[in-house]
A protein has these predicted regions:
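Active-site region of glycoside hydrolase catalytic domains
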Residues: 2, 37-46
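Carbohydrate-interacting/catalytic domains
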Residues: 28-30, 44, 49, 53-226
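Active-site clefts of carbohydrate-active enzymes
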Residues: 2-26
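Generic alpha-helical structural context detector
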Residues: 7-10, 38-41, 89, 93
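Conserved interdomain hinge at the start of the Helicase C-terminal
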Residues: 33-34
């Protein structure tokens, strides 16, 4: 499916761009935009980035002109140093360098705040977690959509690919350097240690393997198993 469907955050047919710049605090939602771009490039599909996103265009309104802002009128209007441009550049490089992000199978992952009860994020704003797996390579993406509170918890990973104490390398964070991100190592969960709630309403037990992750508000991380 990922080879045939184009995915996007916004386009010229929508009434407003995905990125919102509040008049009173223009950069309040910058991290949400870079988080969304990272998810766009990591999820299944062919990512399509609407022009101007990388330059922070944020028009809204009922007329077509509201989301078709002119980018080329001023001299040197395209800023290669813009933080959004740099984030897109980094995420695109990660996608290009990781075949699992282009061709891998996709699995949404249950999460836990206490290390015992796991399930899909049931609160808003929540935490999005998924894996892309190709052969023996697993990429884990975790996004904390809460703009105010951080998140510390665990994400289930593939049991067969992740022996206890497996470590993950941080390929991307939209908020800080890779060295500052707290992640792993993988923990073993015996059958009597976990309760896994599935999207269809079913409940199962372990054994399972879980990856500890700590995220800042509006932070997304892309991780690769070593």
């Amino acid at each position: 499916i990922g080879r045939y469907f184009v995915t996007f955050l916004d386009n010229h047919d929508q009434g407003q761009r995905f990125y919102y710049s509040a008049p009173a605090n223009p950069h309040a939602y910058d991290d949400q935009l870079t988080m969304a771009v990272a998810c766009l490039f990591a999820l299944q599909g062919i990512p399509c980035l609407y022009y101007g996103t990388e330059q922070g265009l944020h028009g809204s309104g009922n007329s077509p002109e509201a989301v078709r802002e002119a980018l080329w009128g001023a001299p040197n209007a395209f800023d290669r140093g813009h933080p959004f441009y740099q984030a897109v550049r980094q995420v695109a490089a990660v996608r290009a360098g990781q075949p699992a992000l282009r061709y891998g199978r996709q699995y949404f992952r249950p999460i836990s705040g206490n290390g015992a009860q796991f399930g899909m994020s049931a609160f808003t704003p929540g935490v999005l977690a998924f894996s892309r797996i190709l052969d023996d390579a697993e990429i884990v993406v975790v996004a904390n959509t809460d703009p105010q509170a951080g998140w510390q918890g665990q994400v289930l990973v593939d049991l067969a690919l992740n022996p206890p104490m497996t470590t993950y390398r941080v390929l991307f964070s939209n908020r800080r350097s890779a060295a500052d991100v707290q992640v792993g190592p993988v923990q073993h969960k015996a059958a009597d240690m976990v309760e896994i709630h599935h999207a269809d309403g079913g409940v199962s037990a372990g054994p399972a393997r879980a990856l500890p992750v700590t995220l800042w508000p509006s932070e997304v991380v892309i991780l690769r198993r070593l």
